[in-house]
Structure formats: structure tokens, C-alpha cells
């Protein structure tokens, strides 16, 4: 029912998977999703107005806290919707086996990227949230090339890169490499240099198993950065030579990398 959709707008996306390979129908679903998310936001705001905080009791002590919780719920709903749409852009075995589905996938990716672009333009904070949550790295080439507003990611990549999670650091470096190819700008080069410096620091402090976990996935990213910014070639070559020396030293001690 409409009331159920207002409570949980993500129900709109719980549809037949074939919808995500049919461009015209997907456009309709996205229009419904956009309206449902807006209606849900409006209903939550109306709820706060209709149910004022009469006395400071329980866990909520101010209207500001209630507003903060509402905004967090809205952000969670919207980011979850975007994550579902991103997952729909993944190539499946069925796509590979049917040429007509590959054409449909390209169309669907274009439609979803256009939708995400509008969302990111209107809510840059949502772009940050989605990328801090992360998504399959094989989609980075799709999002960076298909979403014109992806350059705004350059603003928060240093913060993403500083996270303690190796997974987030790998994602950040990979994201920078694709952005560097797409936007060979001074700002992108500065962020790319920061990535190289961060990797150099991590190389000297990480244990061998975590070093392997970090550097194997980012090797292709470093190649892309070199392609976009040849001036960083010397720094990246130095980093890789240092990595090779450490690996050789560990191998001599019986701690070689696994193939």
C-alpha cells in the first residue's frame, strides 16, 4: 500500500529482477522511487511537527537530536536505495551468455548513472556516504565515466584514505586512479600524490600479510595514475622498488608472498 511505501520506500526496488534489464520500465520505477523517497522525507518531517517533544524524558533530550535522527534515517534509506541500484549495474553470468542482455545492461547503466548524477548534485553528502560505504570496485569505471558529478569525490578522498580499514584505503586508491584518467586536473594529481605517499607510509608499517592484502589490488590503480600523470612515475617506481626490496628480504627469511 501507499502507507507501506512511505514507511519503507525501498519496497519500490523489491521487484522482478528483469526490471533491471529493461530500460523503459526501469525509468518508471526510478520516478516512483524518487517520489517515494521524497514522500517519506516529508512524512518524517511532518511526524516531528505533529509529535513535539513535550518534556525531556527518555533518550531524546532535544528537538535537535530528533532532527538528527530523522536525517540519519533518511540518509540510510537513500544510500541503501543507491547501493541497490549500483548492484543492478553488475554484469552477471546471464548477461554474458545473452548478447541482448549486454545491450540492455549498457542502457540500464546509463539510466542509473544519470539518476545517481542528479542525486549527487542535489545531495553531495549522499555521494560521500555511498563512497564511504563502498561498492564493488569493478563498478568504478562505470560510475566515474557515467556520472558527470563524480569529480566531487576528490573533496573527501583524503578523509576516505585516512580510514583505518584496508578495504576503504584500497577503494580510495582505485577511485583516485579512475578519476585521474577521467579528470586529469591539478587537484586530481594532488590527491593521486597523496595516495602514493600514503602507500609509501603503509609499506613501512604494515605486517607482511596485510602488505600483500593492500598492494596486490592497487597495482593496476598505480598504472592508471602513471598513465594520467607521468610526472608521478618516478615516485611510483620508487615505491614499487621499495616494495620489491622488502619482499625479497622477507623471501630470504622464508616469508615470501603467496602466488
Q: What do the PLM-derived regions correspond to, one by one?
A:
Residues 1-259:
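Extended alpha-solenoid scaffolds built from HEAT/ARM-like alpha-helical repeats
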Amino acid at each position: 500500500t501507499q502507507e507501506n511505501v512511505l514507511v519503507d520506500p525501498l519496497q519500490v526496488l523489491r521487484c522482478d529482477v528483469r526490471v533491471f534489464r529493461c530500460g523503459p520500465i526501469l525509468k518508471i520505477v526510478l520516478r516512483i522511487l524518487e517520489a517515494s523517497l521524497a514522500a517519506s522525507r516529508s512524512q518524517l518531517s511532518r511526524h516531528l511537527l505533529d509529535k513535539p517533544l513535550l518534556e525531556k524524558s527518555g533518550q531524546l533530550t532535544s528537538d535537535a537530536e530528533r532532527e538528527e535522527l530523522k536525517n540519519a534515517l533518511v540518509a540510510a534509506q537513500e544510500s541503501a536505495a543507491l547501493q541497490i541500484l549500483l548492484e543492478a549495474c553488475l554484469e552477471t553470468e546471464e548477461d554474458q551468455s545473452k548478447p541482448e542482455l549486454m545491450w540492455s545492461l549498457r542502457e540500464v547503466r546509463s539510466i542509473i548513472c544519470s539518476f545517481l548524477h542528479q542525486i549527487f548534485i542535489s545531495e553531495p553528502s549522499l555521494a560521500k556516504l555511498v563512497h564511504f560505504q563502498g561498492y564493488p570496485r569493478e563498478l568504478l569505471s562505470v560510475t566515474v565515466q557515467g556520472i558527470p558529478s563524480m569529480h566531487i569525490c576528490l573533496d573527501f578522498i583524503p578523509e576516505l584514505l585516512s580510514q583505518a580499514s584496508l578495504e576503504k584505503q584500497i577503494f580510495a586508491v582505485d577511485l583516485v586512479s579512475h578519476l585521474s584518467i577521467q579528470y586529469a586536473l591539478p587537484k586530481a594529481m594532488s590527491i593521486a600524490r597523496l595516495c602514493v605517499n600514503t602507500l609509501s607510509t603503509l609499506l613501512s608499517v604494515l605486517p607482511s600479510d596485510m602488505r600483500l592484502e593492500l598492494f596486490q589490488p592497487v597495482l593496476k590503480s598505480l598504472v592508471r595514475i602513471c598513465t594520467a600523470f607521468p610526472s608521478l612515475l618516478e615516485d611510483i617506481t620508487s615505491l614499487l622498488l621499495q616494495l620489491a626490496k622488502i619482499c625479497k628480504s622477507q623471501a630470504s627469511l622464508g616469508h615470501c608472498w603467496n602466488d
